[in-house]
Regions:
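Hydrophobic h-region of N-terminal signal peptides that target proteins for export
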Residues: 10-18
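Solvent-exposed loop/turn segments at secondary-structure junctions
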Residues: 40-43, 72-77, 103-109, 178-182, ...
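Oxyanion-hole/transition-state-stabilizing segment in secreted/luminal serine hydrolases
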Residues: 49-50, 79-150
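Catalytic His-Asp segment of secreted/periplasmic serine-dependent ester chemistry enzymes
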Residues: 47, 177-287
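Sec-dependent signal peptide hydrophobic core
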Residues: 5-9
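Generic structural signal for well-ordered alpha-helices
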Residues: 84, 156-160, 208
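Serine-esterase "nucleophile elbow" of acetyl-processing enzymes
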Residues: 19-73, 78, 83-94, 98, ...
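Positively charged n-region of N-terminal signal peptides that target proteins for export
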Residues: 1-4, 170
Length: 287
């Protein structure tokens, strides 16, 4: 028992003391009102409960932004239209940037990837290319954006269509999901790490790639946090960035828990720094 106490004490000493950013970066982001849509990594309740600070708290300190936070634990792309409705009800057009950081729960829920478009052959008039005459009708393939809430791409289409309609003059930025470690959050919420495929046979990489595709489909910037943030929960050397990197007993239930899915304050600070320097390349205000 004494040996266990000594090990725990040493682990506590090894945890990093998270310093606040030394100074604000002077940029076009100072004073920008940024709405954050997403899941548990964005959820403000983790700050309110004292679990850890978040990337958007650190962005306030790094860039001087103002945060409007709508992310909710467990939410998927299918919840983004509802978060958008709440943003509209609360702030109307008084927002500069909408940032969407979601998708990891779609992977965990085994949501099929689906398609961006359906396709059909239609008869259409074509004028202008060499060899065509005015009024000539010809068969051409035509695609239609799929609004399908049962697939990942379809959900993104629904959400982005709503955001583009509601905020045509605002900066909308997508963030990819980040790497996933194992998480034993409760007896009813056990999630294996990213080396495991989900229930439809897809790895989390596929869900990251689809968000990157969405940038081209919907003409919005995508920041690939999965690649640039540096958080890699599969490596023991990265244990210092996660909320509960090793099995430990819950103070409430006494049951063992682990969490390499949610960054701790040190992890969120690293996220924020990576994100801040990417954001410097984009305008914060378009209208």
């Amino acid at each position: 028992m004494k040996r266990l106490a000594v090990i725990i004490a040493l682990l506590c000493l090894a945890l990093p003391v998270v310093a606040k950013p030394k100074a604000e970066i002077k940029s076009q982001w100072r004073g920008a009102r940024v709405a954050y849509l997403g899941d548990s990594i964005t959820d403000k309740r983790q700050v309110e409960k004292g679990l850890n600070d978040t990337y958007w708290v650190y962005l306030e300190q790094l860039l001087g932004t103002e945060s409007l936070v709508y992310g909710i634990s467990g939410h998927q792309w299918s919840h983004i239209p509802g978060q958008t409705d709440k943003l509209i009800a609360d702030h109307a057009q008084n927002v500069d940037v909408i940032m969407i950081f979601v998708g990891t729960n779609d992977y965990n829920a085994s949501v099929p990837l689906g398609e961006w478009y359906s396709e059909e052959v239609v008869n259409v008039e074509v004028t202008g290319p060499k060899g065509t005459k005015s009024g000539v009708m010809t068969d051409r393939k035509k695609r239609t954006i799929l609004m399908d809430n049962s697939t990942y791409r379809g959900r993104i289409n629904i959400a982005m269509s709503k955001l583009k309609e509601a905020y045509p003059t605002k900066q909308i930025i997508l963030l990819t999901p980040i790497h996933r470690g194992d998480a034993f959050l409760s007896d009813r919420n056990i999630q294996p790490d990213e080396l495991h495929a989900n229930g439809v046979g897809e790895y989390v990489d596929a869900y990251v790639d689809v968000v990157k595709e969405a940038g081209s489909v919907w003409a919005v910037p995508v920041i690939d946090l999965n690649a640039i943030c540096g958080l890699y929960p599969l490596a023991e050397s990265n244990a210092l960035y996660w909320r509960r990197p090793a099995l430990e007993k819950s103070s409430k239930s006494g049951k063992k828990r682990t969490d390499r899915l949610h960054p701790n304050s040190a992890g969120h600070l690293r996220l924020a720094k990576a994100l801040a320097y990417q954001l410097l390349g984009y305008p914060a205000k378009l209208d």
